[in-house]
C-alpha cells in the first residue's frame, strides 16, 4: 500500500491535475493511507503480541519482539508524520506558524519514507522462513 501511494497515486495526480488541485488529491490519499496504517498497526500489534507472548512463555524470546518494535516504529511515523504535522502544514500554508511549509513537507516525507522502510523490514522478517 505504501509503495502504491508513493509511486502511483501521488505521481498520477501531478501528471494529470493542475498544481492547485494536486495538494488536495494527495492530501486525501495520504489521509486515507494514514487511517488505514493506524488500523493495520493495531491489528498487527494484536497478532504479534500474542506470538511474542507465546514465544516468551516457551523461552524463545522476549515479550517485546523485534517485530513489535517495527510495528511501533511504523505507527510512530504515521502519528508524527501525518497526524502531528498535517495541522502544522495547513497553518503554514495559510501563513501562520513558525515553520515553513516546505520544511514541514520534507519532515512528513521523511517520516513516510522511514515508515515504508520499517514496513518492508517487517514484511521481510515475517515472510516465508
Summary of predicted features, one role per range:
Residues 1-42, 46-55, 93-98, 102:
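Interfacial loop at the N-terminal end of multi-pass membrane proteins
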Residues 9, 85, 119-122:
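Hydrophobic/aromatic residues in alpha-helical transmembrane segments
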Residues 59-75:
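Interfacial segments of alpha-helical transmembrane regions
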Residues 1-4, 36-37, 71-81:
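Alpha-helical transmembrane segments of multi-pass integral membrane proteins
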Residues 29-30, 67, 99-116:
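Individual transmembrane alpha-helices with interfacial aromatic-anchor signatures
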Residues 36-44, 111-122:
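Hydrophobic cores of alpha-helical transmembrane segments in multi-pass inner/ER membrane proteins
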Residues 72-87, 112-116:
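Mid-bilayer segments of alpha-helical transmembrane spans in multi-pass integral membrane proteins
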Residues 125-129:
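Short, charged juxtamembrane terminal tails flanking transmembrane helices
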Amino acid at each position: 500500500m505504501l509503495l502504491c501511494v508513493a509511486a502511483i497515486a501521488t505521481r498520477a495526480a501531478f501528471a494529470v491535475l493542475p498544481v492547485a488541485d494536486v495538494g488536495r488529491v494527495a492530501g486525501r490519499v495520504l489521509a486515507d493511507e494514514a487511517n488505514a496504517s493506524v488500523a493495520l498497526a493495531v491489528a498487527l500489534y494484536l497478532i504479534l503480541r500474542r506470538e511474542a507472548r507465546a514465544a516468551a512463555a516457551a523461552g524463545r524470546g522476549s515479550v517485546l519482539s523485534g517485530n513489535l518494535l517495527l510495528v511501533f516504529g511504523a505507527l510512530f511515523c504515521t502519528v508524527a508524520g501525518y497526524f502531528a504535522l498535517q495541522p502544522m502544514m495547513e497553518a503554514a500554508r495559510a501563513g501562520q506558524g513558525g515553520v515553513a511549509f516546505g520544511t514541514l513537507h520534507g519532515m512528513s516525507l521523511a517520516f513516510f519514507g522511514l515508515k515504508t522502510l520499517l514496513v518492508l523490514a517487517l514484511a521481510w522478517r515475517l515472510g516465508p522462513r
